[in-house]
């Protein structure tokens, strides 16, 4: 079986593997230069300035958030063509009610899609989440008032204050989960009612405890989220660990990482391994959880059934190469990771 993923460092990389083979790395977009050199063209010739978030869209294209140039890019994986779908390239906060491509964004960190194909973008420095309508390409703010802070629980999400939100995840029941990292909380927006609430975290900055109720208890630096049915998977940047929240019971379960920064534990239990500032997380086939272990410059895989962790890409020194086995390739602070639904 062929398996492919996309990860973001300064360039987008793709991994492929057959059952009996090592993972292989290949660049699919970007150059080694971050400067803006155009909105459209062959992906391997277009510069991508600080690509952080990646996601496969409902059209099977790869969507990339370009933090440095405040845009969302679309990579047609069939043709290799790269284009801009949101953001005019200027830093700011404007454009609601108009075309997404004309809007000013401010450090878009992640992109996700709802079941109807509408795009959601979290803007870290605008402290908001915006929605781009699939049919009209109209952009609107759905969470955050543009001011940094903490307020709004129990009220309208558009009137709430967030603090440098980094990651979002969407469930199938109209819920948007937000890694409100500056507030050390995870918040949920009900799309149907427009109401926001905190479902995990507090003002106290320390690691959670295994089996602890999520609401009202600390959760240290939630940086990346992904959702799978009743489970919300969480990477803690300051907490150097991975957690699972049972959304029905509201309980946190420890998955990986001791909470101490470092690099150790491959081949053993993930809970006793060391991570260093993980900033990306994604579920894959075979009950695999993939983690961008950013400050270790590697991608790691957690087997959810066995609880064993392994490194599948990166050798720890920073810098990026391609066309080699995953365990021989150097990465440079990988941030985003995603796995296509069809394994490509």
Where are these regions (language model features)?
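Bacterial N-terminal signal peptides
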Residues: 4-14
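Gly/Pro-rich loop segments of beta-rich domains
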Residues: 22-50, 79-107, 136-164, 193-221, ...
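Residue-level detector of Asp-centered blade-edge/turn motifs that repeat once per structural unit
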Residues: 56-59, 113-116, 170-173, 227-230, ...
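Conserved beta-propeller blade signature
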Residues: 61-63, 118-120, 175-177, 231-234, ...
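Short loop/turn segments immediately following the C-termini of beta-strands
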Residues: 67, 124, 181, 237, ...
């Amino acid at each position: 079986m062929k398996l492919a993923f996309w990860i973001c460092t300064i360039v987008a990389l793709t991994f492929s593997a057959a059952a009996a083979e090592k993972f292989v790395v290949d660049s699919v977009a970007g150059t080694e230069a971050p400067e803006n050199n155009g909105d459209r063209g062959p992906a391997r010739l277009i510069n991508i300035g600080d690509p952080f978030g990646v996601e496969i869209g409902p059209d099977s294209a790869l969507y990339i958030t370009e933090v440095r140039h405040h845009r969302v890019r679309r990579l047609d994986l069939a043709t290799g063509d790269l284009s801009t779908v949101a953001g005019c390239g200027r830093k700011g906060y404007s454009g609601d009610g108009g075309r997404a491509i004309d809007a000013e964004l401010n450090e878009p960190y992640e992109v996700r899609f709802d079941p109807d194909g509408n795009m959601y973008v979290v803007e870290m420095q605008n402290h908001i989440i915006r929605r781009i309508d699939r049919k009209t390409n109209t952009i609107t703010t759905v969470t955050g008032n543009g001011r940094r802070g903490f307020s709004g629980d129990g009220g309208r999400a558009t009137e709430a204050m967030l603090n440098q939100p980094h990651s979002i995840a969407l469930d199938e029941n109209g819920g948007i989960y937000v890694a409100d990292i500056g507030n050390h909380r995870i918040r949920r927006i009900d799309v149907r009612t427009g109401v926001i609430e905190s479902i995990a975290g507090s003002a106290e900055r320390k690691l959670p405890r295994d089996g602890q109720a999520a609401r009202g208890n600390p959760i240290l630096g939630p940086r990346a989220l992904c959702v799978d049915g009743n489970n919300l998977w969480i990477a803690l940047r300051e907490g150097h660990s991975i957690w699972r929240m049972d959304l029905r019971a509201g309980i946190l379960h420890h998955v990986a990482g001791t909470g101490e920064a470092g690099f150790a534990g491959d081949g053993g239990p993930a809970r006793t391994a060391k991570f260093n500032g993980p900033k990306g997380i994604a579920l894959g086939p075979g009950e695999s959880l993939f983690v961008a272990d950013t400050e270790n410059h590697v991608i790691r895989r957690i087997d959810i059934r066995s609880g064993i962790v392994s490194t599948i890409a990166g050798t720890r020194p920073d810098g990026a190469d391609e066309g080699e086995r995953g365990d021989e390739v150097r990465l440079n602070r990988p941030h985003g990771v995603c796995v296509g639904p069809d394994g490509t």
